[in-house]
Amino acid sequence: MIDFGNFYSLIAKNHLSHWLETLPAQIANWQREQQHGLFKQWSNAVEFLPEIKPYHLDLLHSVTAESEEPLSAGQIKRIETLMRNLMPWRKGPFSLYGVNIDTEWRSDWKWDRVLPHLSDLTGRTILDVGCGSGYHMWRMIGAGAHLAVGIDPTQLFLCQFEAVRKLLGNDQRAHLLPLGIEQLPALKAFDTVFSMGVLYHRRSPLEHLWQLKDQLVNEGELVLETLVIDGDENTVLVPGDRYAQMRNVYFIPSALALKNWLKKCGFVDIRIADVSVTTTEEQRRTEWMVTESLADFLDPHDPGKTVEGYPAPKRAVLIARKP
């Protein structure tokens, strides 16, 4: 059973304590009524993992844990088998005691694009919206963050996160809650808020930007990463039934239009930090994610287009400040 008591105890002592007015009841409701049919199977995989305290832990350059003495072949096989029970692994990679989880996404490449543009994360309390398996939260901790809180309603991601946490010595500097941002009160408590790979899935993107703003302290920093298309400040793509085989893609603005959206929501010091085409080296099928990936979603005769004929995925990073 995944227990959130440590997180409650942690925030009871800090500026997030007012969250306890609503959070425990929400989590209790989720535990009672909303668990996925496979959740027990996934949580069992976490439970059966060994508790290991890493002798060497690198969260600055990667997510890598090593023991003082190499694990036996049997121990490594046990860890690998249990982690494979949590497939598909989409966000990573992770290197854990000789088990190398080669995830669909090279999330480390995204982090390398984002990190140089951020305010120093040292000592910061961070919210990561749509955090997936929590890979980037561990990198935030590696960059000096005091506390990283992730929210993502996908329950497999929660179990993946808890599995990695257990293999990192039950590290309590990062926590994942199975919630969507619409379930959070306006906490106004985070120094930095990340929303990466979420905006295009929202039916109301401006509402999402307001929700992000409501989580920031005054002078806090927003890090927004999302799909964009080429064009001027008035260019927005509204895909038909699917975009790159995804049904739940609603709005893809140009980077300049997105800058205007942020301005309209009251953000200042808005800058476009990076624009990059997503490659089939960064997102691809692996033995830890064996179903279709980006190469299957692009036009086989023109990789500059999706199978539906839209521009192929391009992602921008924008940084903004809440005044």
Swiss-Prot record:
Binding site for carboxy-S-adenosyl-L-methionine: 91, 105, 110, 130, 152-154, 181-182, 196, 200, 315
Keyword check for Transferase: yes
Any Gene Ontology biological process: tRNA wobble uridine modification
SUPFAM superfamilies for the chain: S-adenosyl-L-methionine-dependent methyltransferases
EC category name: transferase
EC numbers on record: 2.5.1.-
Catalytic activity: carboxy-S-adenosyl-L-methionine + 5-hydroxyuridine(34) in tRNA = 5-carboxymethoxyuridine(34) in tRNA + S-adenosyl-L-homocysteine + H(+)
GO molecular function, one term: transferase activity, transferring alkyl or aryl (other than methyl) groups
Record's keyword terms, sorted: Transferase, tRNA processing
Function in brief: Catalyzes carboxymethyl transfer from carboxy-S-adenosyl-L-methionine (Cx-SAM) to 5-hydroxyuridine (ho5U) to form 5-carboxymethoxyuridine (cmo5U) at position 34 in tRNAs.
Family of the protein in this entry: Belongs to the class I-like SAM-binding methyltransferase superfamily. CmoB family.
HAMAP family: tRNA_carboxymethyltr_CmoB
Protein name: tRNA U34 carboxymethyltransferase
Species this chain originates from: Escherichia coli O81 (strain ED1a)
